[in-house]
Amino acid sequence: MPNASDQSFPFPILIGDIGGTNARFALLTDAYGEPRQLEPIRTGDFATIEEAMQKSILDKTSVQPRSAILAVAGPIKGDEIPLTNAHWVIRPKDMLASLGLEDVLIINDFEAQALAIAAPADQDVVQIGGGAVRPFNSRVVLGPGTGLGVAGLVYAQHSWIPVPGEGGHVDLGPRTERDFEIWPFLEPIEGRMAGEQILCGRGIMNLYRAVCAANGEAAVLADQAAVTTSALSGADAAAVETVSLFATYLGRVAGDMALIFMARGGVFLAGGISQKILPALMKPEFRAAFEDKAPHSALMRTIPTFAVIHPMAALSGLAAFARTPRDFGVAMEGRRWRR
């Protein structure tokens, strides 16, 4: 199978961001037009992705896509790709056979987020401290969501190259006196505290319950939405502390990723949680934790951080790649199927 990103895809191209709960699609009719957003699909409403695409997209449009470029949350190995947090198993060969497609590429969901930060529009990001972006320097994107997604973006050979990985599973340990009070009450995974155990939707509840337990109080808020809403309104003291600590711990992990990639091109926070708690991220705690990386604090103060506020950032990244794949070093070997 080809692995060169300069090989184009036949238009029209269906691009999709397939998450654990929702699947979002857009149609790109040519290399110059804007992608046409389609109604989001709940993955639980359909038995297979083929059924979802046929009934929700193909049956409702006169445009027949010739290609599909999909970003999925799950390991891409072989001809069957199970989603990490949903029941769908993506079988590209079946998509070619049943949906009239000629070309299918499957990439990691945070590769798509990384593609989106190559050239974000000013209106799609909000800067949270630091200096100016250094053009063509490495970048990092982190996204607390169902889990904690992390990817790098490096520039080499005249191309932006996304670097996916499992950075959300790095260790996250206590540092302050308050951390040491809270940590015994956090739920670990197989005996260790990974970043994803705190820095995601369920992680907010993990942290909230631990804060309440450390205070000797009952955890009265039922879900992540209640915690974040109560924190932003100031209605619940434990929720306020939870979101403040969440911002601190996200700053620590984001700072670690910035050091790993020497991300002078910027560190970007993606996803719905980052957008919702943006007021908390704009407070000093996030940047203070991000910059607290002795002996490199002076360097860290120069690295800009941003919240991505584009509602469909992954789709914008996929669209940029679909238009001009030669501008990106996306590995295709073992991930592209054609007939």
Curated annotation (Swiss-Prot):
Q: Where in or outside the cell?
A: Cytoplasm
Q: Which residues form a coiled coil?
A: none
**GO CC term, one of those recorded:** cytosol
Residues annotated as binding ATP are 16-21
Matching Gene3D superfamilies: 3.30.420.40, 3.40.367.20
The record's SUPFAM superfamilies line, in alphabetical order, gives: Actin-like ATPase domain (SSF53067)
Q: Which organism is it from?
A: Sinorhizobium medicae (strain WSM419)
The record lists the catalysed reaction(s) as: D-glucose + ATP = D-glucose 6-phosphate + ADP + H(+)
The family this protein is said to belong to? Belongs to the bacterial glucokinase family.
Q: Which domain of life is it from?
A: Bacteria
Keyword Cell inner membrane applies = no
Q: Which UniProt keywords apply?
A: ATP-binding, Cytoplasm, Glycolysis, Kinase, Nucleotide-binding, Transferase
Q: Which GO terms describe its molecular function?
A: ATP binding; D-glucose binding; glucokinase activity
What is the protein's name according to its record?
Glucokinase
EC no. given is: 2.7.1.2
Q: Name one GO biological process term.
A: glycolytic process
- Asked if the Swiss-Prot or TrEMBL record annotates the protein with the keyword Kinase, the reply is yes
Q: One matching Pfam family, short form? A: Glucokinase
Q: What is its main location?
A: cytoplasm
